[in-house]
Amino acid sequence: MSIPFTIGLSAYLYLPIRAAHSPLMNWGEPSTLERFLWHIGGKQYRVWIFSSTEAAGQQLKYFVDSLPMEFAYVGVVIGLIGLAGLWRGSRKLFIATILLFLTCVFYSINYDIHDIDSYFLLAYFCVVLWSGCGLFVVLSWLNSRLRWNKVNAFFIICISLLPLFVHYGRSDESKNYLVEDYTMNMFASLEPNALIFSFQWDYWVSASYYYQLVKGVRPDVAVVDKELLRRSWYLKELEHRYPWLIQESKIEVEAFLRELYKFEHNLPYEPNIIQARFVGMISSFIHKSLDSRPVYVTSEIDAEFTQGLQRVPQGLALRLLPDNEFHPTTMPPLKFRPFARSGRLEDMIRKLYADSFVMRGVYYYRAGNSNEAERAFREALNYDPANPDPKNWLRAIHR
């Protein structure tokens, strides 16, 4: 068994080989033994594993609540029958699958992230195996009494097709263009050769890398994920893609990397110092780029990174300017294809659109242009009708 197991692991050798040849995005930079082990061991994500019993309880509740629906309820019932059948017919397989199921669930519930479903795949696979055994038990029982092969075949077909009818509506993404549209609209909000800082990873940053590197859309824009800046490999990635950004702030980058080395290598470090160096580095990126290119942030970037600068709403982003004057801006035509389904990601994208119009409305309201402000607040409600902020501002205008 050791030889097939080793052959299976050999697929990981692709990572250091490819990383050594300057790929389009060298995620984790697994070109050395240390970084290779960090990469396959998920070192970057360990801060979210075994973080708290409260998080584990929430994830366990989510798993238990969602499991029956994953198998259209009937699948779980048949799976329990199959589990009982395994106990009688194959005790070793029963124990093996129970251990796989429990260890998968125990490990996964201790990972405090939103997109947890894929980490339960092994547990789902065990339920599928139990369901298959359950079908065998049920059909064997029916066949021994009825001997109606056509009925048995019809039963199998119905059970197999049931999840398709139950899940199709909530799994169909064929008309979901929310991320694509939001990414293109964000690009449309930025002037040529722009630099933008954001950590809206799920909503447009990750998609922007695909559109830039694969499709060649807006390669002039430097998109920087603020949270990935906490990783040394990402700073090397930026040095490869945007050498001017790192070179102009070399002193601040090196000061941060000295502290980051301690954190990444589990050495004693001062949280206040590493955070101060982190803020100083990003502030340097921003201030040293203002004279040569338009610089933007998205709304979630904290004010400590942009001290002394005005945030001017421009499309879906905020342009940073070193003055307090009013700068009239235009909202680019936004392509928005609605998607009826609700969910964490879908609802947040609608809110991000609304928030952009609210910020625009507030900017114009404070400049004394109530008409433009009202238009912006009403537009915000078109994207997120339940959002209280534009409603409150509209009441303030008409007070």
Where are the regions a protein language model picked out?
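Hydrophobic alpha-helical membrane-interfacial segments at the cytosolic entry of transmembrane helices
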Residues: 1-16, 154-159
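Transmembrane-helix signature of polytopic, lipid-linked glycan biosynthesis machinery
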Residues: 36, 84-86, 98-118, 165-170
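C-terminal luminal/periplasmic domains and tails of membrane-associated envelope-modifying transferases
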Residues: 184-195, 209, 215-399
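Hydrophobic/aromatic-rich transmembrane helices and adjacent perimembrane loops
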Residues: 95-98, 106-140
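Signature aromatic-anchored transmembrane alpha helix within multi-pass, membrane-resident enzymes
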Residues: 87-91, 133-165
